[in-house]
């Protein structure tokens, strides 16, 4: 089975800041798309996925501070308790930077398992802040979306690595 992840012998080009900013914008807009019923249960936090991807792939370009501001941006757009996404995204970014080398050693599907843990922790942190703020506990289906996000991880990684790949790969096998 072919692997679409960056191979060890392949050197990726650095990501362009404009490309990173556009992917952040698309993640933000994807979070704002309305979903109802079962689709709402399956909808992952796209902005968290993009933040996680860039913190793992380009840690010098995306860090805890940028994740914090993206979280504040999400809080304002969601009209939720101010700071809940900011805290969760900042902790997610720190965790991604901490486990970065470990995650990069795995294939995309093994990375997805690691990403699932990070996304579940992020969702639990948002839930904790909501509950402390007085919101009722959601149903168990609240934790389905982070698992769907982990399943989206390989596709997201392939799509975001495409512009970074060299034009012609002349690697001898």
Roles of regions detected by a PLM:
Residues 1-173:
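Terminal, non-globular segments
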